[in-house]
């Protein structure tokens, strides 16, 4: 039998060590908790308080309150639109921060997915409610807004600031994007022509089948384009001046992050959830807003709704043009248009297919013709690789003509209903 006094002595000898170990463990846990809290507070400060657009955030909760307390659909629509605008910008910011940690390939896929997340979320809620024309027109409006208004304002502002010289950009990149946009026009044109020439094999079904097949082809084409861009090719399709940029500046611009990877993921999840909530109220208020504001649904969908997703892109495109970084401006404006036409629209067709909704690529003749003419105008503007304020002014004036056209346009499907 062991001596109890020996056991007690051993316990007394090891007691201070056990106490020190427990104290050290609690200190480590406390320090980790403190670091977590400090990191969380820092990310909140950066994400919430560094963007002036966030002054519009209170309009989001206000729109929800108005939805349940009044029947003023016009105010609910406007407040929802204002509330989503800063969320769209912060969603893009969180995506860019996460892309820093993931590398160019995954970062490119993230940008393809979340770059136009606001438009996709609004489109999915509209699809859920069977508002196929709102989906088609809002996505068309985003393309037109980016190509004409965003790029026009950027060219105009950059041309005024740098009026003594021509601003140049990569012609090769512009040609590739123009080609993809023309392919998107082709994908939208054939279902419309098939419908209006009454040459379908199965009336009302052939255009849907063709749209679904074309959407899959367009998604493959966009995936190939992404791979082509992200495969590390050092050729004419890289942005101009990239080879001349000092390594220090490149590292400084490309690799520095303001928030951590897990913080970026958390913000992406929270912002996407909040955009989803507000999008539901926005979509539900569209028809009521059309009546109360005395505006056509087509005008709201094509002109007003794209403001939600394009406000941040508009500001950043102008800023980069004023800094004489035209390739980044084109990446924002034309790149976003390419992404919507070759990824978001086909993706919505596939999602509608899964939902049992007959979402197709028949955007009607008026909308398809508008897109076709716009792509041609922009392609001619970009063919020489030079930007100036006159080109910007012409693009802005073209957008005003488009806006006026949709203000007096009566949607044939709406009138039939």
UniProtKB/Swiss-Prot annotation:
UniProt xrefs under Pfam families: Na_Ca_ex
Entry keyword annotation includes Transmembrane helix: yes
Gene3D superfamilies listed in its UniProt record: NCX, central ion-binding region
Entry keyword Protein biosynthesis: no
GO biological process, one term: intracellular calcium ion homeostasis
GO MF assignments: calcium:proton antiporter activity
UniProt topology in membrane: Multi-pass membrane protein
TM helices/strands, residue ranges: 46-66, 74-94, 106-126, 141-161, 174-194, 208-230, 259-279, 292-312, 331-351, 361-381, 390-410
Extracellular face residues: 67-73, 127-140, 195-207, 280-291, 352-360, 411-417
Keywords for the protein's UniProt record, in alphabetical order: Antiport, Calcium, Calcium transport, Ion transport, Membrane, Transmembrane, Transmembrane helix, Transport, Vacuole
Positions of the UniProt region annotated as Cation selection: 115-150, 309-344
Tissue expression as described in the entry: Ubiquitous.
Main location: membrane
GO CC annotation: plant-type vacuole membrane
Subcellular location: Vacuole membrane
Spans within the Cytoplasmic topological domain: 1-45, 95-105, 162-173, 231-258, 313-330, 382-389
Function as written in the Swiss-Prot or TrEMBL entry: Vacuolar cation/proton exchanger (CAX). Translocates Ca(2+) and other metal ions into vacuoles using the proton gradient formed by H(+)-ATPase and H(+)-pyrophosphatase.
Family: Belongs to the Ca(2+):cation antiporter (CaCA) (TC 2.A.19) family. Cation/proton exchanger (CAX) subfamily.
Protein name: Vacuolar cation/proton exchanger 3
Organism name: Oryza sativa subsp. japonica (Rice)
């Amino acid at each position: 039998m062991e001596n109890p006094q020996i056991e007690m002595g051993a316990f007394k000898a090891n007691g201070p060590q056990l106490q020190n170990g427990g104290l050290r463990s609690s200190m480590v846990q406390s320090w980790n908790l403190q670091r977590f809290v400090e990191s969380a507070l820092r990310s909140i400060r950066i994400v919430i308080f560094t963007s002036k657009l966030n002054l519009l955030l209170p309009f989001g909760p206000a729109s929800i309150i108005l939805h349940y307390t009044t029947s003023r659909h016009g105010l609910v629509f406007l407040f929802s639109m204002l509330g989503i605008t800063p969320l769209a910008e912060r969603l893009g910011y969180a995506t860019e921060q996460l892309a820093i940690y993931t590398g160019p390939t995954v970062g490119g896929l993230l940008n393809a997915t979340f770059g136009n997340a606001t438009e996709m979320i609004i489109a999915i809620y509209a699809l859920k409610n069977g508002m196929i024309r709102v989906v088609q027109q809002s996505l068309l409006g985003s393309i037109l807004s980016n190509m004409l208004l965003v790029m026009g304002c950027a060219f105009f502002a950059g041309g005024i600031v740098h009026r003594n010289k021509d601003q140049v950009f990569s012609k090769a990149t512009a040609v590739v994007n123009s080609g993809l946009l023309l392919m998107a026009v082709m994908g939208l044109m054939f279902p419309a022509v098939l419908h209006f020439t009454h040459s379908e094999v199965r009336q009302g079904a052939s255009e849907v089948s063709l749209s679904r097949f074309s959407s899959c082809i367009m998604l493959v084409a966009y995936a190939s384009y992404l791979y082509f861009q992200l495969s590390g090719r050092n050729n004419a399709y890289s942005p101009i001046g990239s080879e001349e940029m000092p390594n220090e500046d490149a590292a400084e611009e490309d690799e520095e992050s303001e928030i951590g990877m897990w913080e970026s993921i958390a913000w992406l999840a929270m912002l996407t959830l909040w955009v989803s909530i507000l999008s539901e109220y926005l979509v539900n208020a569209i028809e009521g807003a059309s009546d109360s504001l005395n505006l056509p649904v087509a005008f709201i969908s094509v002109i007003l709704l794209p403001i939600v997703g394009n406000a941040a892109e508009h500001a950043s495109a102008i800023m980069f043009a004023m800094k004489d970084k035209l390739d980044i401006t084109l990446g924002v404006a034309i790149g976003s248009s390419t992404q919507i036409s070759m990824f978001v629209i086909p993706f919505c067709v596939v999602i509608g297919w899964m939902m049992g909704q007959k979402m197709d690529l028949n955007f009607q003749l008026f909308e398809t013709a508008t897109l076709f003419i716009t792509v041609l105008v922009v392609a001619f503007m970009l063919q020489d690789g030079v930007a100036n304020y006159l080109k910007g002014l012409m693009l802005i004036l073209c957008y005003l003509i488009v806006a006026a056209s949709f203000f007096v346009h009566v949607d044939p499907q709406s009138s039939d209903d």
